[in-house]
């Protein structure tokens, strides 16, 4: 490493070049075939894919079906499809959006209203439930849940 010294009337100043900082993050490979942050990369363009499941809602006016990603609440996905479902708090702390799970599996970890026994009986709050498989849910069940 080269240094330059300058003297002026008895004072000396030394200039040392600043070392180059290493790069903060190496580039990620485009497609390694391994999971990246829990998601798998695709074979074209390194796109990541997320699971989406078929949700069938049994409503008072008939059955409706739509696809719901595994990271979107069922109530939110239904609204995006133009399906009108009851709700109030949107936080899993009331029972306005209550339904009854008929088939499939859900993740309801974000809700705080239902107890474990109610979940085991199939009760679901659509505002705080993610699908983890294809599901069928009877909607508009608040009165039945709270009776």
Swiss-Prot record:
[2Fe-2S] cluster binds at residues 89, 94, 97, 127. It comes from Spinacia oleracea. The keyword Plastid applies. Keywords: 2Fe-2S, Chloroplast, Electron transport, Iron, Iron-sulfur, Metal-binding, Plastid, Transit peptide, Transport. GO terms for cellular component: chloroplast stroma. This is Ferredoxin-1, chloroplastic. Binds 1 [2Fe-2S] cluster. The lineage of its organism: Eukaryota, Viridiplantae, Streptophyta, Embryophyta, Tracheophyta. Its main location: plastid.
